[in-house]
């Protein structure tokens, strides 16, 4: 059988309680709505709705 090796060029994500906000994104492949929200986040956050801020 073939063993798939990790891509060590990308930082690995480890969920740790002592370091709660790592630099690595939790989702590698964003949906269309998530991408739209990311673009909207680049502008002023005061324009975001409460639901968008929680998302």
Swiss-Prot record:
Residues with PTM N6-acetyllysine: 4, 35, 42
Modified-residue entries (N6-succinyllysine), positions: 4, 35
Intracellular or extracellular location(s): Mitochondrion inner membrane
Residues annotated with Phosphoserine modification: 31, 33
Keyword Membrane on entry: yes
Pfam families: COX4
Membrane topology: Single-pass membrane protein
Chain intervals for the UniProt region annotation (Disordered): 32-55
GO biological process, any: mitochondrial electron transport, cytochrome c to oxygen
Domain of life the protein comes from: Eukaryota
A GO cellular component entry from the record: respiratory chain complex IV
Self-association and partners: Component of the cytochrome c oxidase (complex IV, CIV), a multisubunit enzyme composed of 14 subunits. The complex is composed of a catalytic core of 3 subunits MT-CO1, MT-CO2 and MT-CO3, encoded in the mitochondrial DNA, and 11 supernumerary subunits COX4I, COX5A, COX5B, COX6A, COX6B, COX6C, COX7A, COX7B, COX7C, COX8 and NDUFA4, which are encoded in the nuclear genome.
Function according to Swiss-Prot or TrEMBL: Component of the cytochrome c oxidase, the last enzyme in the mitochondrial electron transport chain which drives oxidative phosphorylation. The respiratory chain contains 3 multisubunit complexes succinate dehydrogenase (complex II, CII), ubiquinol-cytochrome c oxidoreductase (cytochrome b-c1 complex, complex III, CIII) and cytochrome c oxidase (complex IV, CIV), that cooperate to transfer electrons derived from NADH and succinate to molecular oxygen, creating an electrochemical gradient over the inner membrane that drives transmembrane transport and the ATP synthase.
Protein's name in the database: Cytochrome c oxidase subunit 4 isoform 1, mitochondrial
Source organism: Saimiri ustus
């Amino acid at each position: 059988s073939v063993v798939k090796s990790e891509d060590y060029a990308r930082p690995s994500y480890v969920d740790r309680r002592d370091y709660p906000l790592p630099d690595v994104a939790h989702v590698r492949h964003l949906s269309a709505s998530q991408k739209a929200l990311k673009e909207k986040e680049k502008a002023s956050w005061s324009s975001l709705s409460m639901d968008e801020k929680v998302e």
